[in-house]
């Protein structure tokens, strides 16, 4: 089975941006989210990962714009950012996206998250945003600025709730082009039977090949952001490298 690549479109104030380590204020602008998403579709993407960073940081939202973008795309969309209650979840799903990615809600409101998983099943993925603190993997919430508790305890709880897939980000790697945390991915795969989507740190085609080497352990896909925008490689090159 080949690795699914999900090019990322992160949106701030109506513009496609990339952050460094998820820090507000570290944005580099890349123009229209619509143009970015359509470009990835034209380059052969089967999925696009779209993040409303304003909603993630709790400073507004780009919901109407993103609904328009999802509506224009023919490919599947994973929608993320600020989905923390019934209203934001239903609005996200109403865009017609393939699935949504819950982050902070899984940490701060486990009962609600469990209900969402029970109701929507495969439409719900949970983002596990991780940072190594004193030798232990800890989760981060609210745009990665709040403490979220122990990774393994949360993963066990979400597995029990029936979570269908996890998007695993090493926050220290994201937007840095320093390579993915393969050890973290392997450990998460060993701890759950649910498929895992990797995120953060991809800088070269070889990084993607290394992640593809974990497909037989449970890694299903990889989100790719800054490396594509920075021109390290093209999406067609990446897709060719990890197909089959």
UniProtKB/Swiss-Prot annotation:
GO terms for molecular function: 1-(5-phosphoribosyl)-5-[(5-phosphoribosylamino)methylideneamino]imidazole-4-carboxamide isomerase activity; phosphoribosylanthranilate isomerase activity. GO terms for cellular component: cytoplasm. It comes from the Bacteria. Pathway: Amino-acid biosynthesis; L-histidine biosynthesis; L-histidine from 5-phospho-alpha-D-ribose 1-diphosphate: step 4/9. The active site is at 10 (proton acceptor), 129 (proton donor). Signal peptide: none annotated. It holds the Pfam family His_biosynth. One of its GO terms (biological process) is L-histidine biosynthetic process. CDD domains: HisA (cd04732). It catalyses: 1-(5-phospho-beta-D-ribosyl)-5-[(5-phospho-beta-D-ribosylamino)methylideneamino]imidazole-4-carboxamide = 5-[(5-phospho-1-deoxy-D-ribulos-1-ylimino)methylamino]-1-(5-phospho-beta-D-ribosyl)imidazole-4-carboxamide. Keywords: Amino-acid biosynthesis, Cytoplasm, Histidine biosynthesis, Isomerase. InterPro entries: Aldolase_TIM, His_biosynth, HisA/PriA_Actinobacteria, Isoase_HisA-like, Isoase_HisA-like_bact, RibuloseP-bd_barrel. It is an enzyme of class 5 (isomerase). It is found in: Cytoplasm. Its EC number is 5.3.1.16. Belongs to the HisA/HisF family. NCBIfam families: hisA-trpF. This is 1-(5-phosphoribosyl)-5-[(5-phosphoribosylamino)methylideneamino] imidazole-4-carboxamide isomerase.
């Amino acid at each position: 089975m080949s690795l699914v690549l999900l090019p990322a479109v992160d949106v701030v104030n109506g513009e496609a941006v990339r952050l460094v380590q998820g820090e507000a204020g570290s944005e580099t602008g890349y123009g229209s989210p619509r143009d970015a998403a359509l470009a990835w579709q034209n380059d052969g993407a089967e999925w696009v990962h779209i993040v409303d960073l304003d909603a993630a940081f709790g400073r507004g939202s780009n919901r109407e714009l993103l609904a328009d973008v999802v509506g224009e795309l023919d490919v599947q969309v994973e929608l993320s950012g600020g989905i923390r209650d019934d209203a934001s979840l239903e609005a996200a799903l109403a865009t017609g996206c393939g699935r949504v990615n819950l982050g902070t809600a899984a940490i701060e409101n486990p009962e609600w998250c469990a209900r969402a998983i029970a109701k929507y099943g495969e439409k719900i993925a949970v983002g596990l945003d991780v940072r190594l603190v004193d030798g232990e993997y800890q989760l981060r919430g609210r745009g990665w600025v709040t403490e979220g508790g122990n990774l393994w305890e949360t993963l066990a709880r979400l597995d029990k709730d029936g979570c269908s897939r996890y998007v695993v980000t090493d926050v220290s790697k994201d937007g840095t082009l320093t390579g993915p945390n393969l050890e973290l991915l392997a450990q998460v795969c060993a701890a759950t039977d649910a498929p895992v989507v990797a995120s953060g740190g991809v800088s070269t085609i070889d990084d993607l090949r290394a992640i593809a080497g974990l497909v037989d352990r449970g890694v299903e896909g990889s989100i790719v952001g800054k490396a594509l925008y920075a021109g390290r490689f093209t999406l067609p090159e990446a897709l060719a490298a990890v197909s089959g």
